[in-house]
Amino acid sequence: MEKAYRIKKNADFQRIYKKGHSVANRQFVVYTCNNKEIDHFRLGISVSKKLGNAVLRNKIKRAIRENFKVHKSHILAKDIIVIARQPAKDMTTLQIQNSLEHVLKIAKVFNKKIK
């Protein structure tokens, strides 16, 4: 993803944690916060070291990023943080995609119905 679509600064993460609202399922927690300064979404991903080694954590992050790339045109202009939970480490990429889509629908991140 391009730099404009990333959240990297700790201050941005803290603002979203405090002012945003959260939705969760067993595998992911999603924090969302409106951002009027930009006209597209921004994504921050957090995968704890408790989930496994670097290879596994990066696999989870790649699957999350890929899901956002696929739905890029359907996502509202919000700041979004995705936190992976312990059960995500045993999932395939397709299962991660389905679970993430489920929690994003609950968080009302999409601007239209997704299958």
Curated annotation (Swiss-Prot):
Organism of provenance: Staphylococcus aureus (strain Mu3 / ATCC 700698)
A single Gene Ontology CC term: ribonuclease P complex
Summary of the function given for this chain in its UniProt record: RNaseP catalyzes the removal of the 5'-leader sequence from pre-tRNA to produce the mature 5'-terminus. It can also cleave other RNA substrates such as 4.5S RNA. The protein component plays an auxiliary but essential role in vivo by binding to the 5'-leader sequence and broadening the substrate specificity of the ribozyme.
GO biological process terms on file: tRNA 5'-leader removal
EC number: 3.1.26.5
InterPro entries: Ribosomal_Su5_D2-typ_SF (IPR020568), Ribsml_uS5_D2-typ_fold_subgr (IPR014721), RNase_P (IPR000100), RNase_P_CS (IPR020539)
Cleaved signal peptide residues: none
Protein name (database record): Ribonuclease P protein component
Similarity comment: family membership: Belongs to the RnpA family.
UniProt GO MF annotations: 3'-tRNA processing endoribonuclease activity; ribonuclease P activity; tRNA binding
Entry keyword set: Endonuclease, Hydrolase, Nuclease, RNA-binding, tRNA processing
Catalytic activity: Endonucleolytic cleavage of RNA, removing 5'-extranucleotides from tRNA precursor
Lineage top rank: taxon: Bacteria
Quaternary structure note: Consists of a catalytic RNA component (M1 or rnpB) and a protein subunit.
